[in-house]
Amino acid sequence: MDYSMSTALYDIDYGMSEPCQKIDVKQVAARLLPPLYSLVFIFGFVGNLLVVLILITCKKLKSMTDIYLLNLAISDLLFLLTLPLWAHYAAAEWDFGGAMCKVFTGMYHMGYFGGIFFIILLTIDRYLAIVHAVFALKARTVTFGVVTSGVTWVAAILVSLPDIIFTRSQKEGFRCSCSPHFPASQYQFWKNFHTIMRNILSLVLPLLVMIVCYSGILKTLLRCRNEKRRHRAVRLIFAIMVVYFLFWAPYNVVLLLNTFQEFFGLNNCSSSNRLDRAMQVTETLGMTHCCINPVVYAFVGEKFRSYLSAFFRKHVAKRLCKHCPLLPRETPEPASSVYTRSTGEQEISVGL
């Protein structure tokens, strides 16, 4: 789990000028986090599992965008599968041993970074489809999507390695913890590196890519003659950027303040406790982005919603209502090449 999140679960923090009691923070976490994590897990798991099932059974992964959407959903599922254990950890202690501590820490961070990287790829994919449409016909193939997805997973594993290596389960006070333990001689370096890397990769880089790509997309869309579709596309772009910023910026700001408490004059017990509580709230807020991803990247497409309706008619309605009137048959999609435009692209004809 994230470094700053785990520190809030200790009874005492000896990093202050004098020992700082963390019992109140632990009690708040024990009451607040388990139900919040459970809600995020339920809604996020259902939404992302539906995306995976529809992409595989209905869309058949016919485009590069489908490949990226599938991997984004898998990243979110990997991340979400760790939440039940973190919920138990917040309420009690780590009861699952050292091996599980490392495994679930790895799943958490690979899902976290993988999700961010695939959002970046989807942003670039949309940019190519709209701004460089001719080039995109040759470049945006299923094969290229599979290759870049493989490279992206390798990158997600590499940036997760420090957390996997330094995280371990051990007895801390009266409870067993699962948290990072940096070498004492390099403690400050690794703590600062961890925070700066996370801020760059999860906030600065995605927002920079979004600003550059969506600025180019907006310039192209403003020349679109279909005013209704143009306005819909502009609203969608604005919503994607605002949602990402609102969900992840608070967490990254609090993480920065928490790591550099002395620099910001916050290295006292009361400030540390407030930052720990803020970390609990903002990280949970960031986690809920996993529930939003299926909506803004998949279900917003009219064609994807038709696949969702067909999926429920075929796999759910028939089982729940065996004696209902004959359900309308789904219309098969005409065969298409690897260059077929994806769900979001069909929605406004150019890539969103």
Swiss-Prot record:
GO terms for molecular function: C-C chemokine binding; C-C chemokine receptor activity. The keyword Phosphoprotein applies. GO terms for biological process: calcium-mediated signaling; cell chemotaxis; immune response; inflammatory response; positive regulation of cytosolic calcium ion concentration. It holds the Pfam family 7tm_1. It comes from the Eukaryota. The modification Phosphoserine is found at S336, S337, S342, S349. Residues 1-30, 90-102, 167-198, 261-277 are extracellular. The chain crosses the membrane at residues 31-58, 69-89, 103-124, 142-166, 199-218, 236-260, 278-301. Its main location: membrane. One of its GO terms (cellular component) is external side of plasma membrane. Residues 332-352 are annotated as: Disordered. It is found in: Cell membrane. InterPro entries: CCR1-9-like, Chemokine_CCR5, Chemokine_rcpt, GPCR_Rhodpsn, GPCR_Rhodpsn_7TM. Glycans are attached at S6, S17. It is a multi-pass membrane protein. Sulfated on at least 2 of the N-terminal tyrosines. Sulfation is required for efficient binding of the chemokines, CCL3 and CCL4. O-glycosylated, but not N-glycosylated. Ser-6 appears to be the major site. Also sialylated glycans present which contribute to chemokine binding. Ser-17 may also be glycosylated and, if so, with small moieties such as a T-antigen. The modification Sulfotyrosine is found at Y3, Y10, Y14. Keywords: Cell membrane, Disulfide bond, G-protein coupled receptor, Glycoprotein, Lipoprotein, Membrane, Palmitate, Phosphoprotein, Receptor, Sulfation, Transducer, Transmembrane, Transmembrane helix. Belongs to the G-protein coupled receptor 1 family. Interacts with PRAF2. Efficient ligand binding to CCL3/MIP-1alpha and CCL4/MIP-1beta requires sulfation, O-glycosylation and sialic acid modifications. Glycosylation on Ser-6 is required for efficient binding of CCL4. Interacts with GRK2. Interacts with ARRB1 and ARRB2. Interacts with CNIH4. Interacts with S100A4; this interaction stimulates T-lymphocyte chemotaxis. Receptor for a number of inflammatory CC-chemokines including CCL3/MIP-1-alpha, CCL4/MIP-1-beta and RANTES and subsequently transduces a signal by increasing the intracellular calcium ion level. May play a role in the control of granulocytic lineage proliferation or differentiation. Participates in T-lymphocyte migration to the infection site by acting as a chemotactic receptor. This is C-C chemokine receptor type 5.
